[in-house]
Amino acid sequence: MQGRSRKLACSMLAGAFCVTSLAEGSAQSLSTYGTPGLVEMPTARVLKDGDLAFTASAFGPNYRYSATFQVLPRLYGTFRYSQIKNITTNAFLDGDTFDRSFDVHYQIWDETDLRPAFAVGMRDFLGTGILSSEYFVATKSFGSKLEVTGGLGWGRLAGRNSFSNPFSILSDRFDTRSSGFSGTGGQLETG
């Protein structure tokens, strides 16, 4: 019984420290990709300069482990290692797949009283392309309790056969995204 009481007291103390640290300032929410966002959707927010965040997330049978680092005041990058279960796209990737990927996100401008924060980003452009996407996103706060995010995404963030990707001015590979995956990862992928 005494062991149980000690465990309960330690758990309550740890919980109190967590609540206290969250109350000191608004915590940045991180998505299942380990980047500022909500669930799967990125926001135009960035971390504080020099911040480093490690995350682990599970979504069904899939797992993602990420390290996000704020390189410059407006630029962050993310290294991610994912375990994706039961892929049956082609013979090479049948079954469980382990994917390494890299993301980059650049905040073009900060939020003001009248204008939302605005950012552009690319997910999984150094990897197999399983999670690849590109996006524009805007985020605006209304008071201290409401934040609205909207954007436009391609690749994994969009459906098929929608309008053309503006990143296609950089490479034709952004115009047509294959239904499978590209290679085994570790190479620069732009579409």
Predicted regions: what is each one?
Residues 25-133, 139-146, 150, 154-159, ...:
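Transmembrane beta-barrel domains of Gram-negative outer membranes and organellar outer membranes
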Residues 163:
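Short aromatic-enriched loop/helix-cap "lid" or pocket-rim segments at secondary-structure transitions
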Residues 1-32:
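Cleavable N-terminal export/targeting peptides
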